[in-house]
UniProtKB/Swiss-Prot annotation:
Main location: cytoplasm
Residue numbers binding substrate: E360, A361, N362, R486, A487, S488, G489, T490, R495
Top-level enzyme category: isomerase
Keywords (A to Z) from UniProt: Carbohydrate metabolism, Cell wall biogenesis/degradation, Cytoplasm, Isomerase, Magnesium, Metal-binding, Nucleus, Phosphoprotein
Cofactor note: Binds 1 Mg(2+) ion per subunit.
Cofactor(s) listed in the protein's UniProt record: Mg(2+)
SUPFAM superfamilies attached to this UniProt entry: Phosphoglucomutase, C-terminal domain, Phosphoglucomutase, first 3 domains
Compartments (UniProt record): Cytoplasm; Nucleus
Gene Ontology MF: a single term: phosphoacetylglucosamine mutase activity
Pfam families per record: AMG1_II (PF21405), AMG1_III (PF21404), PGM_PMM_I (PF02878), PGM_PMM_IV (PF00408)
InterPro entries per UniProt: A-D-PHexomutase_a/b/a-I, A-D-PHexomutase_a/b/a-I/II/III, A-D-PHexomutase_C, A-D-PHexomutase_C_sf, A-D-PHexomutase_CS, AMG1_II, AMG1_III, PAGM
Protein name as catalogued: Phosphoacetylglucosamine mutase 1
Residues with Phosphoserine modification: S51
Length: 518
C-alpha cells in the first residue's frame, strides 16, 4: 500500500505533505468504517486538515463516537493499516480488526480550505463506498464543528439527524442562543463590545462571519485575514500559532492596531484561539491559553459558589504553563493538576472533575461538564434561591455554549468575551490579573533522545542519572526559577524550558541547563 513512507497516527491523526497522504486517507476511511461497525453503527467523523501547518501539508484525523479523539487502541490500528506493505497484508488487517455486525457503518466527512482537501475527500468517499458505509459530506467545515456534529448525532434520538445528519445551522443556533442567555444585563453596557478576529485565511472565516451576523446586536466581531481563495495565504504571517510564536500581531495588522482594543487570532482549522492587545505605549501584550483558562475558571468558580452546587472544579495544565498562572490559580483556591503534554492527556484529566478546564498555552482547550453536573443543573436536588437559580442557569448556558467535544476557537471566543463582560474586565484589566514570568524555550540536538525519561507530568527527569539533581541546583540560584528538560516526540532533540523573575535570569538559566544537556 505504501512506498518509502512511514505513517504514524498521533493526537493530530496523520499529518504530512499533501502529496504523500493518499494511503493514509484511504486507510483512515477503512478504519473509520471498522470503528463504526465495532460500535454497532455509531457515527464516526473523518476530518481532512493540517490545522496551523503550511498550505502544502495536509492531514486526516478520525473523530470517535463521543465527539472526542479516537480511542488510543485504534491509533495503533490506523498506523498498521496505513503502513501495510501489500494489499494482502492490508486485507488481512481488515479481517483482524473487523467486528461482525449487521449494522451499516456511518461516517461524516469534513475538510478545510487547502487546495488538496477536496481531492483527498473524494478518495475518502471511494474508500467508504468500497466499505459499504453510509456517509454525509459536510464540505468545508471547522474541525471543532465536525467533532460537535458527531457528538450531537450519537446523543440524538431524532431520526432525521441519524439518517440525514443535522444541518450545520444547529451549531450556530445552539452557540449563539446560549451566548445570548449569559447575563443579558451585561449586553446593555458591555466592557468588551467589539473584537477584531484574525481568521488565518482558513476554514474558520465563513463560520465566524455567520456567528458575527447572529450576535451583532450584543457584540461586534470584525474579521480580517479571511481570504480562503488564495491558498498560499493560509497561516502565512497570520493565525494563532504565528502570533504566539512571534509575540506580535499578524502582518496584515501591523501598524493598524488600536491601543486597548481586544484582538484575537484563530488557527487554520479554528481549534486554537489567542487574544492580544497593545497598550498606550504600543507595547504588545499576549493573552494566551493560560490567560483564557484562568479567566474562565475564575468566573465559573464564582458561579459554582453562588449556585450552592457541591461541584468539584479544577484546571489541568502541562509543564509549559507559565508558573505565574499556576500561582494565580492556587491563590484563588482552585485545584490545579498537571499532565504530560498532549490534548488527549489534558482532556482525560479534565473529565475527572464535575467542571474541568484545560487550555494549552497555544490556545487549544475547552471546559468539560460531567454528566453528573449536567443532571444536577437540570434538576437541582434542593429548592434554589433566586440567586442560586440565576447562577445555575448561567452554568447551564456555559455548558451549552462551550464545545463539550473538543477545543473550539469560535465557542471559546464567545465564552471568554462573556466572562470579560461579567467581570467588567477590558483587555488591560485581564492582562494585569497576573504577570507572566519571563521564560525561554530552546532545543538541543542530541544523539539519542530516548535516554531522556521524565516523570511528574514531564516536569522532572529520571534519566540520565544525576541530571535532574544538577538542574535542581541551578534552579535554586534563581528567584522564581523553574526549568525542565523534555525529549521531543518526533526528532532527535530535547526541549529545554526555563522561567525566572527577570528575562535575563530566564535566558541565563535556559542556557545553563542546555549546557548540562550537552
Amino acid at each position: 500500500m505504501t512506498k518509502n513512507k512511514k505513517y504514524s497516527y498521533g493526537t493530530a491523526g496523520f499529518r504530512t505533505k499533501a502529496s504523500d497522504l493518499e494511503a493514509a486517507v484511504y486507510s483512515s476511511g477503512v478504519a473509520a468504517a471498522l470503528r463504526s461497525m465495532e460500535l454497532k453503527g455509531k457515527t464516526i467523523g473523518v476530518m481532512i486538515t493540517a490545522s496551523h501547518n503550511p498550505v502544502e501539508d495536509n492531514g486526516v484525523k478520525i473523530i470517535d463516537a463521543d465527539g472526542g479523539m479516537l480511542a488510543m487502541e485504534w491509533e495503533d490500528k490506523c498506523t498498521q493499516l496505513a503502513n501495510a506493505p501489500s494489499k494482502a497484508e492490508f486485507d488481512f488487517l481488515i479481517k483482524q480488526f473487523l467486528t461482525p455486525t449487521t449494522c451499516q457503518p456511518k461516517v461524516i466527512i469534513g475538510y478545510d480550505t487547502r487546495p488538496s482537501s477536496p481531492r483527498l475527500a473524494e478518495l475518502l468517499k471511494v474508500c467508504l463506498d468500497e466499505m459499504s458505509a453510509s456517509y454525509i459530506d459536510y464540505g468545508y467545515i471547522t474541525t471543532p464543528q465536525l467533532h460537535w456534529l458527531v457528538r450531537l448525532i450519537n446523543k440524538s434520538t431524532a431520526a432525521s439527524f441519524l439518517e440525514e445528519g443535522p444541518p450545520i445551522t444547529e451549531y450556530y443556533d445552539t452557540l449563539t442562543s446560549a451566548f445570548s442567555k449569559i447575563d443579558p444585563s451585561m449586553q446593555d453596557s458591555p466592557t468588551v463590545s467589539r473584537v477584531v478576529v484574525d481568521c488565518a485565511n482558513g476554514v474558520g472565516s465563513q463560520p465566524l462571519k455567520t456567528v458575527a451576523g447572529l450576535v451583532k446586536d450584543s457584540l461586534s466581531i470584525e474579521l480580517v485575514n479571511t481570504d480562503v481563495r488564495a491558498s498560499e495565504l493560509l497561516n502565512n504571517g497570520c493565525g494563532a500559532d504565528f502570533v504566539k510564536t512571534k509575540q506580535s500581531p499578524p502582518l496584515a495588522l501591523e501598524g493598524k492596531i488600536k491601543p486597548n482594543q481586544l484582538y484575537a487570532s484563530i488557527d487554520g482549522d479554528a481549534d486554537r484561539l489567542i487574544f492580544y492587545y497593545i497598550n498606550q505605549n504600543r507595547k504588545f501584550h499576549l493573552l494566551d491559553g493560560d490567560k483564557i483558562s484562568t479567566a474562565l475558571v475564575g468566573y465559573l468558580n464564582i458561579l459554582v459558589k453562588k449556585s450552592g452546587m457541591p461541584f468539584s472544579l479544577g484546571v489541568v495544565q502541562t509543564a509549559y504553563a507559565n508558573g505565574a498562572s499556576t500561582e494565580y490559580l492556587q491563590d484563588l483556591g482552585i485545584t490545579t493538576v498537571f499532565t504530560p503534554t498532549g490534548v488527549k492527556h489534558l482532556h482525560k484529566a479534565a473529565k475527572e472533575f464535575d467542571i474541568g478546564v484545560y487550555f494549552e498555552a497555544n490556545g487549544h482547550g475547552t471546559v468539560l461538564f460531567s454528566d453528573k453536573a449536567l443532571a444536577n443543573l437540570a434538576h437541582p436536588f434542593f429548592t434554589p434561591s433566586p440567586v442560586q437559580a440565576a447562577a445555575i442557569e448561567q452554568l447551564q448556558s456555559y455548558s451549552v455554549l462551550i464545545n463539550q467535544a473538543i477545543g473550539d476557537a469560535i465557542s471559546d471566543l464567545l465564552a471568554t468575551i462573556s466572562v470579560l463582560n461579567a467581570l467588567h474586565w477590558d483587555a488591560s484589566a485581564w492582562s494585569n490579573t497576573y504577570k507572566d514570568l519571563p521564560n525561554k524555550l530552546a532545543k538541543v540536538k542530541v544523539s539519542d533522545r530516548t535516554i531522556y525519561k521524565s516523570t511528574d507530568a514531564e516536569r522532572r527527569l529520571v534519566s540520565p542519572d544525576g541530571l535532574q539533581e544538577k538542574i535542581d541546583a541551578l534552579v535554586a540560584k534563581y528567584e522564581k526559577g523553574r526549568s525542565f528538560v523534555r525529549a521531543s516526540g518526533t526528532e532527535d532533540v530535547v526541549r529545554v524550558y526555563a522561567e525566572a523573575s527577570t528575562k535575563q535570569a530566564a535566558d541565563e538559566l535556559c542556557e545553563k541547563v542546555c549546557q548540562l544537556v550537552l
